[in-house]
Amino acid sequence: MLYGFDIGGTKIELAVFNDKLERQYTERVETPKDSYEQWLDVIVNLVEKADQKFACKGSVGLGLPGFVNHETGIAEITNIRVADNKPIIKDLSERLGREVRAENDANCFALSEAWDEENQQYPFVLGLILGTGFGGGLIFNGKVHSGQIGMAGELGHLQLNYHALKLLGWDKAPIYDCGCGNRACLDTYLSGRGFEMLYRDLKGEALSAKEIIERFYAADKTAVDFVGLFIELCAISLGNIITALDPHVIVLGGGLSNFDYLYEALPKALPKHLMRSAKVPVIKKAKYGDSGGVRGAAALFLTK
């Protein structure tokens, strides 16, 4: 059996899948906040419980909300303080007596979508999350491409370019600080949070993404103008990403992926930001939603 974990700041979810990635069992618990040992204990206990339930020694894949250094096995997960900068893979492997694999949650999301029957026709699937943050996962022929140390796909930490700053207005463009230590990272603009901050700073009113989108569909001029600007900002940024990576398909996840107008507007806005000979990839909504993380974590053992 394939065990997939979605490790979050507030909850830890285990889902058990068969080798066809069909879910057999799920359990969620609160994320311990008191100590690293307690955090490890919770994961070990969930694995041992699943082993007993399914009378097997299942494979263990982790989806983590941060960067996993594949050279050192250290995970940088700042929103889970007790496990940040710890040798998670080594410690869990020793405790469980088996190999443990881990990737960041964006890679797991992308891997889950790449293993969907409809997407297996595409050699290169790019998954993009437009949620609390903006991140990416690169899947080549059904396998995560994580680069030299595991940093490939950290697209949220690319920075706004000349055309994006010109679009926002040289004298009024809001420049946001990013948690990575840099400024003007895509994570702070193309995420759901960035969508809201841009509206506030450019239009002078604090609204939720849901409220902005509702006003857009109600033909509110301010919201319509803002969405047009946001689509153009996305097209500029995705144009750079597509030029560099040339994916066959882009799958969008996260809260903003439910804004259906994106799938109509982005393919029309992209060509002017690409080379003449470039091909606009298929852009589609994620199929597995909140289940993508655990499903992709489980699929780590189908791909290496």
Curated annotation (Swiss-Prot):
PROSITE patterns, alphabetized: ROK
Q: What is its EC number?
A: 2.7.1.59
Q: What Pfam families would the database entry show?
A: ROK
| Role summary | Catalyzes the phosphorylation of N-acetyl-D-glucosamine (GlcNAc) derived from cell-wall degradation, yielding GlcNAc-6-P.
Q: Which residues bind Zn(2+)?
A: H157, C178, C180, C185
Q: What is this protein called?
A: N-acetyl-D-glucosamine kinase
Q: Which domain of life is it from?
A: Bacteria
- What molecular functions are annotated in GO for this chain? ATP binding; N-acetylglucosamine kinase activity; zinc ion binding
Quick one: signal sequence residues? none
Please give the CDD domains that the UniProt record associates with this protein: ASKHA_NBD_ROK_NAGK
Residues annotated to bind ATP: 4-11, 133-140
Indicate the family of this protein: Belongs to the ROK (NagC/XylR) family. NagK subfamily.
Q: What is the lineage of its organism?
A: Bacteria, Pseudomonadati, Pseudomonadota, Gammaproteobacteria, Pasteurellales
The biological pathway it contributes to is: Cell wall biogenesis; peptidoglycan recycling
Swiss-Prot/TrEMBL catalytic activity: N-acetyl-D-glucosamine + ATP = N-acetyl-D-glucosamine 6-phosphate + ADP + H(+)
Which keywords does the record carry? Answer: ATP-binding, Carbohydrate metabolism, Kinase, Metal-binding, Nucleotide-binding, Transferase, Zinc
Matches recorded under HAMAP family = GlcNAc_kinase (MF_01271)
Entry keyword Kinase: yes
Entry annotated with the keyword Electron transport = no
A biological process from GO: N-acetylglucosamine metabolic process
